[in-house]
């Protein structure tokens, strides 16, 4: 096996590990919700967010690009399910407001 093949295998393994971390994180969110402890829920959700940023970086999506995609997602038209959530709770509007204040 040459250096290039070895490097490619290493990158694939790393990518698979980060994807597994994301899946584990989603499972932790579900367990934390079932447990009802806010700090555990926040930690588990943070793990998912961080895993998304790390995965994006390894796939060539920079942190700023991901931030911009989130902004576009929040500012753009909502899907049917998202619109239903927005109509009932106003979550997307609240998140947009929060992100604007944070900038």
Regions found by a protein language model. Give the residues of each.
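Flexible "arm" and connector segments at domain edges
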Residues: 1-44, 49-103
């Amino acid at each position: 096996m040459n250096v290039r093949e070895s490097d490619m295998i290493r990158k694939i393994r790393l990518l698979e590990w980060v994807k597994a971390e994301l899946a584990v994180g989603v499972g932790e969110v579900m367990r934390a919700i079932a447990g009802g402890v806010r700090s555990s829920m926040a930690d588990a959700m943070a793990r998912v967010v961080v895993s998304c940023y790390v995965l994006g970086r390894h796939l060539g999506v920079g942190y700023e690009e991901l931030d911009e995609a989130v902004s576009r997602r929040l500012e753009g038209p909502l899907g049917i399910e998202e619109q239903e959530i927005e109509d009932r709770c106003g979550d997307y509007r609240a998140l947009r407001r929060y992100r604007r204040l944070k900038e």
